[in-house]
Amino acid sequence: MELRATVENRIRYSTKHIKHLPPGSITEFDWKDYCPVGFGLIQELEGIDHDDYLLSICTDETLKKISSGKIGNVFHISNDNRFLIKILRKSEIKVTLEMLPRYYRHINYHRSSLFTRIFGAHSVKPLGGVKTYFAVMSNMLHSTIFVNKLYDLKGSPKGRSNKKIEVRNTTVLKDIDFDFCFYVDPLARQRIIKQTKLDCELLEEEGIMDYSLLVGLQSKGSCQGSLDGLNPVYGSFAPPSSFKSNSTKSMKTASSSPDRSSVAMYSCSPDRDSVENEMSMTIQSVTSNSASSETNILATTLSDLFHNSSNINFGMKIPARARRVTRETGEEEWYNVVLYIGIVDTFQDYGMKKRIEHCYKSIQYNSNSISTVHPKIYSSRFQDFVSNIFLPHDDDLSSKY
């Protein structure tokens, strides 16, 4: 079956408010579907009806936004909030199409992949207008999900300040704004790290870099407001005794160095290579008390959490305690949160442009600290970053205090 065949269609649509065209009633769009067979298999795999998909992305308003959009940090959301649309360069479309066969096999075999699913690659060109390339992805933050904070993280703070990107009126923050660690269930952490490794291996083999971890934080029990405006909490798990005896006292963890919080966030967990040993020890610990029915149920649940590869919603609604080190005072704050995570922006290869950018930035900064690096280095650093911000609760936490 040919997964990379391209289909061209011409559709008639309103020209109202479309850039590059004079006002009028009707125009024609040259619409191109790249690899419809391959992306059709992905849509079928994820339970997406193709006709509904086309109706979602071919509305007047959506086409208007796409046709007048800019390349780069621009996201649009379909009217039904099901799909995220990103305008791409032609070279980025090419990277996506070249990866498609292996990408499909990967998400078919690893159903709990953290990849934001790519459902289609298209281009539209109004009659007399400019051709626009774009990809359509799953919207992990659909209209029923409110997040207090949204981060786009690459694992390198160099040049990663916020540039006022917005998704559904939520400002997307970057690495330099990130000051959290997350304490999650040990098996959940192991599965996150293991799946990140599997996903990064594919991207590394395809020569892709510059991807991100999208992290949405939702304060538990709150549907509105900012995380900054909420009172810190300890979370659903009991804090260590040192916390209980002195819960109102601020916990100082930072030195006078202004970069202390960044260091803490990037180096507060064991190395990812110890995950397999952790997993076996955790399972033994959980299952050791077989006399307790609650423990047996918990062991079954946690084993399923880690081993069940058919969980396509993995990465959504992960309960966690968030530890935040404030940059101004170095004090710790704790929040009870629900996490939404996914790997996004898998469109950039390490081509000539990125190689030149790497050389230029290496003159200014440490070559290992910039985001533009060889895919193998990028993959390793990205995995280390993920393992350093996701921590198992209780054991790691108790050992620190």
Swiss-Prot record:
Keyword line: ATP-binding, Kinase, Nucleotide-binding, Transferase
GO terms, molecular function: 1-phosphatidylinositol-4-phosphate 5-kinase activity; ATP binding
Ranges for region Disordered: 242-268
GO biological processes: phosphatidylinositol metabolic process
E.C. no: 2.7.1.68
Catalytic activity: a 1,2-diacyl-sn-glycero-3-phospho-(1D-myo-inositol 4-phosphate) + ATP = a 1,2-diacyl-sn-glycero-3-phospho-(1D-myo-inositol-4,5-bisphosphate) + ADP + H(+)
Superkingdom: Eukaryota
Pfam families documented for this protein: PIP5K
Span list, region Activation loop: 350-371
This protein's record includes keyword Zinc-finger: no
Annotated ranges, domain PIPK: 1-390
Family matches, as Gene3D superfamilies: 2-Layer Sandwich, Phosphatidylinositol Phosphate Kinase II Beta
Compositionally biased spans, kind Polar residues: 242-260
Protein name: Putative phosphatidylinositol 4-phosphate 5-kinase 11
Gene that produces this protein: PIP5K11
